From Swiss-Prot:
Subcellular location, principal: membrane
Topology of the protein relative to the lipid bilayer: Multi-pass membrane protein
Entry function: Orphan receptor. May regulate nociceptor function and/or development, including the sensation or modulation of pain.
Species: Mus musculus
Name of the molecule in the record: Mas-related G-protein coupled receptor member G
Transmembrane segments: 14-34, 53-73, 79-99, 121-141, 165-185, 200-220, 223-243
Amino acid sequence: MFSIFNIWGTFNKVLFFLSLTVSLAGLVGNALLLWHLGLHIKKGPFNTYLLHLAAADFLFLSCQVGFSIATIVSGHEDTLYFPVTFLWFAVGLWLLAAFSVDCCLAYMFPSFCSPNRRPRFTSVVLCLVIWALTMPAVLLPANACGLLKNGMSLLVCLKYHWTSVTWLAVLSGMACGASKFLLIFGNCCSSQPPPKFCKLAQCSGILLFFCRLPLVVYWCLRPVLKFLLPFFFPLATLLACIDSSAKPLLYYMKGRQLRKDPLQVALNRALGEESQSGLGGLSLPMHQV
């Protein structure tokens, strides 16, 4: 019996320090990404989403590192750890859903949704609205269910919780659905290869499915999973840290053409919109017509 607890304790510590290590590496990557996206790359409707997504990932990883260090020093986990980190995680999820859907619409309806035909600050306004709406969407259920303070009302908690579960399910479905649409129709039903931002949406959707969804599931089923699968939360946290840390590397690999390409050149090639080609809508290849 004691050996089982020892194995679980060791496994938990390994996941904890892996999450801390990945978060530290991701902080450096997202800081560089924010620097280049914020100061050295011309803004457009698509890379505006990625700039805000990098900011959300940076805040998520910063909270991970801060609360992890506090846990090491104090010897116990702060009660605010989960709601605060999940707040920035949810902002990133919402931004990723908006980015994927926008890429999908621009690919399907280039005549109406292309960057040149939309109001200039549409993406900026939408990102600011997402930041503003996510805070009450996460903090109100957390407060009602006793994550921010002691004491809770079961009926009020259930009402807020199922509301948050609904919008999280919708966001996850939008992001995954849009990325899968781009993956399938962009490769099978178009005579042209998908534009670079559509490819980034495809890769981000795959990362979301494998690395972000577990933490969403934990938020939705926290009491059950905490009792039945106590290892689920640290594992989901590690996967979420991997997702937030992998995006800068993904952008760099997508933009790199030569082995010795500098970071700024690769990121500008991957995220700059001045060289973005037309999104060209869906059409069947000639040999299928």
